[in-house]
Amino acid sequence: MLSLKKYFTEGLIQFTILLSLIGVRVDVDTYLNSQLPPLREIILGQSSAYTQTQFHNLRNTLDGYGIHPKSVDLDYYFTARRLLNQVRALDRFQVPTTEVSAWLVHRDPDGSVSGTQPSAGIALENSGGLQDGTGPDGAVRESGAEQGFGEELEDLGAVAAPVNGDLTKEDIDLIDILWRQDIDLGAGREIFDYSHRQKESEVDKELSDGRERGDGWRSAGGQVTNRNLLVDGETGESFPAQVPGVEDQTALSLEECLRLLEATFPFGENSEFPAADVSTLSEAVPSESRPAGIQSSLLSPLLPETESPFDLEQQWQDLMSIMEMQAMEVNNTTAETLYNGTSGDLLTSNYNLAPNTPINQNVSLHQASLGSCSQDFSLFSSEIESPSMGGSSALLQLAPDNSTGLNTTFSSTNFSGIFFPPQLNSTVNETAGPELPDPLGGLLDEAMLDEISLMDLAIEEGFNPVQASQLEEEFDSDSGLSLDSGHSPASLSSSEASSSSSSSSSSSSSSSSSSSSFSEEGAVGYSSDSENVDFEEAEGAVGYQPEYSKFCRMSYQDPSQLHYLPYLEHVGHNHTYNMAPGTLDPEEPKLPSVGKKSSKEKPSEFLDKQMSRDEHRARAMKIPFTNDKIINLPVEEFNELLSKYQLSEAQLSLIRDIRRRGKNKMAAQNCRKRKLDTILNLERDVEDLQRDKSKLLREKVEFLKSIRQMKQKVQNLYQEVFGRLRDENGQPYSPNQYALQYASDGSVILIPRTLADQQARRQERKQKDRRK
């Protein structure tokens, strides 16, 4: 008794209070059912005549109920029982409700339960909501009292000794049997517990008070807790029966709420928020005729059961992570207002809606990013707003975005207006106070909106946001192309974007030509800007002198010079020193236009840039003909050209040097060309040989497969023929002694095995001799 009393006072009460403080529902009677010995043993003491071994009890030990309340086995039992109850409740439709459990420390002696029959009558009179079952219940209790166990049924949850303690063994056994049958039938201890019925009577009393002010919805909600007690014909026990009207009322309420939600927020197919019909919602859920607690109890338990098409939990986690990164501080009065009961009622009365409304649960970042949300998201009418709030906007009214840097995807949408409306950010009181700064206001400035635009472009077009800064820096250049643009996974799209940007910002034709050339060549390791600019500078399209390339000479950047090798467009050779722009002769004549170029003049055009030093010296020596003629003319024509002019020795020496160097460079180019041709031819030959080898290997595999199949067929035929042969006595020949020999003329001969082996060895020797 000492340990049991200590368990009641220290263990169970303290543990239950702690669980109730953190919001966990605790039913002490269910634990008392299985964890403790039956109450008759507590009251009367244990007796070997009627004590049964509870082999289902997890806390049983060899010496009885001797486990200390602080034992570690209790945690395992509590967890196992809780999980088992959850598993058993999977097939039932449960509507979550909010229950407040009050623990009575000091009990009034007048309200205590005694074992007499008048106390049962008091319990029935005080239990509002059980009036319909008073007659049958009273009959059952009277019959139980006549049998001598009515008091046990009424005072099953009490720990006081009964007045009439003269129970016999048969009565106690009958009580035990009936109690176990109640447990098997699903009737818990709360049916006969006076404290439980007292709680229900208090709830019914509150509901009846609200029914006096309410309407049809409120009256229907009050009938949910009414119970009818039916009598089981087999056991004689009374248990609550489900009233058909209650189930119909619950089902109709749920269907009506779902229908209202579907009509108000059709998220299934529409991509934008339509205008909500608030009048329907206000008529279905009147607020003036019922307190705020009843609104939350009717709407809040039913609305979470509807499945939203969006992952609301993930969206809210993303939003909270953004808030934590920006280190925002929201006023404590806002949190107190949202989570305090009194201020929550004020908020509910102001907006005619429960705090956890479907609007707050169905707002997602995806829907917030739509373009026309601000026009269609009129979820609340003017009558919902409180007059005390002044000129503030509705609960979820979207404000137009004041930023101009956002693209069309995020236009006319204010995220802060969606998730943190002004009504929630301000302190909720009867006077209109100043609004708090928007928690997400710092996130949607000009710089962040530009970054969002770039991120949207990166998602849709494969644009690399890292190149944005490079493009901005290179808008003033002649081409607008970055040197490392080929490293992007979407180099083609980035080049197109840069070409369009540069061509729109530049007035010269060099940007368009370089961009088109870059788009045709693809992702390369160098920029061909200087080459194309030099072409058009010679044509007169650009009025400034371009710089030379710092990476490779221009004469080796033209793909037309190596048209036979497609991938050598990106390979450049640098065999000479770079020349500064100032070393060029300012009086150099302009080359003819692109349309008048011939195939013979193209090589000389590139060689002029390579031989700028020789050109300079030739102009200084006043040589009457160009370097193109000096290098490209045949020997006879070259000699005739020299004979036409009277040239000095210095001029002749310079002409010969120019011709020799030009011929050497052309020969070197031809040599490199021949080497590359040879390498390419060898590579092609190797590839052809590899293809032939693979083809021969496949044919060999096919031949081996055919030979294997033929051998298998010959072996099967050999066995079939050998099996049909018979000797003089009609007996088959033994395959160990005889074998079939194939003659050259196609006949088959039966010979002994030894002779066949000798012939086979001879054949092998002949084959070896032939190989040698």
UniProtKB/Swiss-Prot annotation:
Q: What ranges does the record give for the region Disordered, renumbered to this chain?
A: 198-223, 472-531, 581-613
Placement of sequence motif Nuclear localization signal: 761-768
What's the family? Belongs to the bZIP family. CNC subfamily.
Matching entries from CDD domains are given as: bZIP_NFE2-like
> Segment Basic motif: which positions?
656-675
One GO molecular-function annotation for this sequence? lipid binding
Keywords assigned:
Activator, Cholesterol metabolism, DNA-binding, Endoplasmic reticulum, Glycoprotein, Lipid metabolism, Lipid-binding, Membrane, Nucleus, Repressor, Signal-anchor, Steroid metabolism, Sterol metabolism, Transcription, Transcription regulation, Transmembrane, Transmembrane helix
A biological process (GO) of this protein is: regulation of transcription by RNA polymerase II
SMART domains given in the database record: BRLZ
Can the keyword Repressor be found in this entry's annotation? Answer: yes
Q: Name one Pfam family in it.
A: bZIP_Maf
Q: What positions are marked as the site Cleavage?
A: 103-104
Please provide the record's free-text comment about the domains of this protein: The cholesterol recognition/amino acid consensus (CRAC) region directly binds cholesterol, as well as campesterol and 27-hydroxycholesterol. Has much lower affinity for epicholesterol.
Basic and acidic residues composition bias: residue spans = 198-216, 598-613
Q: Where are the transmembrane segments?
A: 7-24
Cholesterol recognition/amino acid consensus (CRAC) region: region residues: 191-199
Q: Does the keyword Transcription apply?
A: yes
Residue ranges of the region described as Leucine-zipper: 682-696
What is the name of this protein? Endoplasmic reticulum membrane sensor NFE2L1
Residue spans with biased composition (Low complexity)? 478-519
Q: Which residues are glycosylated?
A: 332, 340, 362, 402, 407, 414, 425, 429, 574
Xref: PROSITE patterns: BZIP, BZIP_BASIC
| Domain bZIP: start-end pairs | 654-717
